[in-house]
A protein has these predicted regions:
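Conserved small/polar residues in nucleotide/adenosyl-binding loops
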Residues: 328-331
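Catalytic-face loop-and-helix region of soluble metabolic enzyme cores
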Residues: 117-213, 224, 228
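Active-site-proximal loop/short-helix segments
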Residues: 22-37, 63-86, 191-201, 306-307
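Conserved, mostly hydrophobic/aromatic
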Residues: 12, 59, 71, 118, ...
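Flexible inter-domain linker/hinge segments
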Residues: 1, 210-295, 302-305
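N-terminal small/glycine-rich loop or linker at the start of catalytic domains
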Residues: 15-42, 191, 285-324
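Hydrophobic faces of well-ordered beta-strands that scaffold small-molecule active sites
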Residues: 19-23, 67-69, 102-106, 126-128, ...
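Alpha-helix-loop-beta-strand connector modules within alpha/beta enzyme cores
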Residues: 83-100, 222
């Protein structure tokens, strides 16, 4: 077992930063592995359990407060065997957590097949996706959420590039806290799916940039939303009003011509014309292809000379005729 996780944790701690290490969860790890021959996930379960037990023990030794285990495989359709495998893993590893608090994080969907099982196991926190998890709200309403656990509510979209609708998110947040659920506001998934920051978008008009939220901006949104959640008079805040205006005022970034064309689409437009037999004949007459045309599956490797010649041609340093001749003579 490597030392990277604990070395980086201690490095951050020395700088006064308390981090939350994140690992792929054991269930998802087993489900994502490729097995050969007659081997299955069950053949490696005991070894994986032993490895994560060691991880928990080392986290406790380093006095890590929170350890996040990502289990996105739980949003798939789960069989009884899948659920049994999940139980076997966590019933063996969770007793080793000692003082470490374990966050089970899910994303890219809801956990309808295993929600009750998750809430009954001794996790300290459970992360749920409220964006792509279409059944997440219904599951909480139907089965409730344990008062002794933290709900990491993925209410800010971690995959798209758009601003969060503060009013809508705060209403969802209030519904959760109104049920007595201890809630931590979070993104629906990791922010690795979006660009780093809007600050570097120097060629876009400010009126368009106002609608964008990349990774840094989404972190700012979380901070602002958290502040509003604790402020009874947040509706009077200028930041809140500015956000509301984004969703109440008409956007001039819409292309009227495209919108008009879309509104005129009919069922007939989904039928390709002319019919296939006529297209096939036209293609034969136009392209004169052999019976079995052969091509490559990609471009040919480019040598250093080819790249230099292309650059020279683009800069106007050589003519098209010279460039063509070089293509035929280059090694």
């Amino acid at each position: 077992m490597g030392e990277k996780l604990w070395e980086e944790y201690e490095e951050a701690k020395a700088l006064g930063i308390e981090t939350k290490p994140v690992l792929t969860g054991p269930y998802t790890l087993l489900k994502l592995c490729r097995y050969t021959g007659s081997k299955t996930a069950e053949d490696f379960t005991d070894a994986v359990i032993a490895a994560y037990q060691q991880v928990f023990e080392k986290c406790a030794a380093h006095r890590i407060m929170w350890l996040q285990l990502d289990e996105p495989a739980l949003v798939r359709d789960l069989s009884k065997e899948d659920i049994a495998l999940f139980h076997k893993i966590y019933e063996n590893v969770l007793p080793c957590k000692k003082t470490v608090r374990i966050l089970l994080q899910t994303y890219f969907g809801d956990v309808r097949d295993i929600y009750k099982d998750l809430t009954e196991l001794p996790f300290d926190g459970i992360g749920l996706d409220f964006i792509e998890g279409k059944e997440t709200v219904h599951l909480i309403e139907k089965y409730g959420f344990p008062k002794d656990k933290l709900l990491f509510a993925g209410l800010v979209n971690g995959k798209n590039i758009w601003r969060n609708h503060y009013d809508r998110t705060l209403n969802q947040l209030q519904q959760l806290t109104g049920k007595g659920i201890q809630t931590v506001l979070s993104t629906s998934c990791s922010l690795l799916h979006v660009p780093y920051t809007v600050k570097h978008e120097t060629k876009l008009s400010e009126k368009y940039l106002d609608y964008f939220a990349f990774a840094e901006e989404k972190l700012s949104e979380l901070k602002e939303l958290s502040g509003f959640a604790e402020n009874p008079s947040y509706t009077q805040e200028s930041v809140y009003k500015k956000n509301c205006a984004l969703f109440t005022e008409d956007r001039d970034c819409e292309n009227a011509a495209v919108k008009k064309r879309l509104s005129e689409v009919t069922e007939k437009d989904y039928v390709r014309l002319p019919k296939r037999s006529e297209r096939q004949q036209l293609q034969k007459e136009t392209f004169h292809l052999p019976q079995f045309p052969t091509t490559t599956i990609g471009s040919f490797p480019q040598t250093k000379d080819v790249k230099q010649n292309r650059a020279a041609f683009r800069k106007g340093e050589i003519t098209e005729q010279e460039y063509t001749c070089l293509l035929y003579t280059s090694d």
